[in-house]
Amino acid sequence: MVFMFLTFTVGTNAQENRKAFTAEEQEIVDLSKCKWDWMSEKNVEKLAELFHENSQFVHMGGYWGKQQELETIRTGGIWYKKAEIHDVQVKFAAGTATVYSRIHLNSEVGGNAVRFPFIVTEVYVMENGKWQLSTLAFTKTLDE
């Protein structure tokens, strides 16, 4: 009986903490998750399709464009091993979708394993009927 109560309580709390997205928001959330998976897998072919030709990537050490980001991922200069996503919000405005995520990023940078807390901003633009990533910016938080 106690087990059933605990199961119900934990299940209810998990559902309460779960964010409900509209279908349009869920499409962007799913695309963002795919991006993290492709980055972890170093799948530069899929990423090249996703990244807009004029995309920019803002890191702690600088910013650069699409080709440099793809090369950095391909060569392992930065290996995005796993993004632990804690919170996600999606906002739409003027043909763009912006994803704000609070994450812990487990990665390898220059051969060193690192784990940082970030607020990540992803800006997607709708072009030729599909969403493309225009901006990916990492803001390190003071949590750790």
Give the location of each predicted region.
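Bacterial N-terminal signal peptides
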Residues: 1-9
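Short, low-complexity N-terminal intrinsically disordered segments enriched in polar/charged residues
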Residues: 11-50, 92-95, 144
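A mature extracytoplasmic/lumenal domain signature
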Residues: 51, 61-62, 89, 103-105, ...
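Hydrophobic pocket/interface hotspot
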Residues: 35, 47-48, 55, 69, ...
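Surface-exposed, charged secondary-structure patches
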Residues: 73-112
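A short gly/proline-enriched turn/hairpin at secondary-structure junctions
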Residues: 39, 50-64, 73-79
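Short beta-strand edge/turn micro-motifs at domain boundaries
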Residues: 117-144
